[in-house]
Amino acid sequence: MSFSDYFDIEKEIINENCLILKIPFKEDYLNKIGAIHGGVIMTLADNASGDLANSFGMVAPTLSMTTHFLRPIIESKYIFAKAEILKKGKRIITVDCTVYGDDKKIAATSRTEFSVTRKK
């Protein structure tokens, strides 16, 4: 079982430049104040961004990731991450991601840069 398997991730491909991942709510994801833990939010954003960046037949490991937490997710049947290509260069792929709950209010945003290293 991989780390990502723990989250029961489901994927919806919108187009070659956009995808959405979702995970079902689990009590295990809550922090001490009863909101979804920031680590879960960042993991989902990282997976969505990474899946998208690595979908072009290239190996593209993460160079950097910046996350901004905007509001807590308190109650939600699912947690979603929508990743979109901002720029796809020959050496760097930049992906923006928004994380939100069922209410569609943005809880966090991230920008991740990936280094295109080689073909798969």
Language model features by range: what are they?
Residues 1-120:
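Terminal targeting signals and extreme-terminal segments of soluble enzymes
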